[in-house]
């Protein structure tokens, strides 16, 4: 089979490369595969998490130099230039603008995305078989899984034990703030997403917004991500450098990211949060909550205070756990995991030959930068090189 050949017959397809997921990492990898002559079959809803799980009024923390193109041609800056947009006029970058860039990038790359969902992936007879929600079946010689963060939300146990469905939500499912106008809301968490959601609620005239967190209030100052460029270049030239560091050295890299991403809040939030309705509760956590007969939620804080709110929002982040990715259930026995993360080689290949995992789940082996869009071009380059090797071994590039 030619590496650029996708065959379709009677609801079944055969492809050298199946890419599961059409977010930034999936699109970046598929585009680069196509550039080197491997025609990928991409399954997913393009930028679905960004469209459906990020509020329309959200802004990105990145600059205009972060993009998806491993070839460095169809960059975000190129998109702005073609659209006649001055980068200074979109700083910070609205999330909807970056989604439009991703659509532009997909079109430039000539990527056709099958708007379906993979329900099950199996590995019979040395190849992969994917069953889609539509019933369609795909046979592939190699697979790139780009699951994003959808499946990896962190949920405190007390929430489900104490509150009925509908009385609480995670930030990723809280995108329509109109229904919270005039409401009393508790946000659990004290990093960027917590304070940005607080600002969005304040913009929507929520009656009370309480932000509770265990640590000091982060500093409102712009993050400096310039140091990431050197780390990306290092990863491109020496893919295994991060995993080969001593534990203390890896921790030092992680602390640098923590300092920029977690100990700082974007200064453009300051004015939006400077309202009587916004209350900060540092050095505190929830020790109990219960629903009241009048419909309120009584929340007890560790500092002795009690609050009554109408809704609880969890800004509690994400943690990779590949056992939570539904379509991987059929191949989990073949995947080596470390604390939920996939164990990957220097080309993002898992312990199951031919199955690659990119994006957020790769952060344990490649570093925290692969939880950011900035890692897309390097991840695409390394992954596609690995895919080429896998296809060579199976004879699919003959």
Residue ranges and their predicted role:
Residues 2-47, 90-203, 208-398:
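Flavin (primarily FAD) cofactor-binding/catalytic cores of flavoenzymes
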Residues 51-84, 229-249:
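Flavin (FAD/FMN) cofactor-binding and adjacent substrate-gating region
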């Amino acid at each position: 089979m030619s590496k650029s050949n996708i065959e379709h017959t009677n609801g079944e397809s055969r492809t050298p490369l199946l890419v599961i997921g059409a977010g930034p990492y999936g699109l970046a990898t598929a585009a680069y595969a196509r550039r080197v002559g491997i025609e990928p079959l991409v399954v997913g809803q393009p930028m679905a998490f960004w469209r459906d799980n990020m509020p329309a009024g959200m802004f990105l923390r990145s600059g205009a130099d972060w993009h998806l193109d491993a070839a460095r041609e169809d960059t975000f800056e190129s998109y702005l230039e073609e659209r006649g947009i001055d980068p200074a006029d979109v700083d910070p970058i609205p999330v909807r603008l970056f989604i439009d860039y991703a659509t532009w990038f997909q079109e430039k790359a000539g990527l056709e995305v099958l708007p379906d969902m993979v329900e099950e992936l199996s590995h019979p007879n040395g190849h992969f078989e994917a069953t889609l929600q539509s019933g369609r079946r795909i046979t592939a010689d190699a697979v790139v899984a780009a699951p994003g963060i959808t499946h990896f939300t962190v949920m405190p146990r007390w929430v489900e034990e104490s509150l009925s469905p509908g009385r609480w939500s995670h930030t990723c499912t809280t995108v329509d703030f109109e229904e919270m106008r005039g409401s009393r809301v508790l946000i659990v968490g004290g990093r960027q997403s917590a304070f940005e959601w607080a600002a969005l609620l304040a913009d929507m005239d929520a009656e009370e917004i309480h932000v509770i967190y265990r640590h000091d209030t982060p500093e409102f100052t712009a993050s400096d991500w310039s140091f990431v460029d050197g780390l990306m270049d290092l990863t491109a030239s020496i893919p295994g450098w991060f995993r080969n560091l001593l534990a203390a050295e890896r921790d030092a890299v992680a602390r640098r990211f923590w300092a920029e991403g977690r100990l700082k809040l974007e200064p453009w939030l300051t004015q939006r949060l400077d309202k009587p309705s916004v209350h900060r509760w540092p050095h505190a956590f929830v020790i109990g909550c219960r629903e009241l007969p009048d419909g309120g939620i009584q929340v007890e804080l560790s500092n002795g205070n009690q609050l009554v709110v109408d809704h609880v929002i969890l800004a509690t982040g994400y943690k990779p756990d590949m056992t939570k990715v539904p379509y991987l259930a059929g191949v989990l026995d073949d995947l080596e995991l470390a604390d939920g993360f996939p164990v990957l080689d220097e080309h993002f290949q898992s312990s199951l030959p031919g199955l690659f995992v990119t994006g957020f789940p790769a952060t344990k082996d490649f570093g925290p930068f692969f939880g950011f869009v900035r890692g897309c071009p390097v991840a695409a380059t390394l992954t596609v090189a690995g895919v080429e090797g896998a296809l060579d071994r199976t004879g699919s590039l003959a």
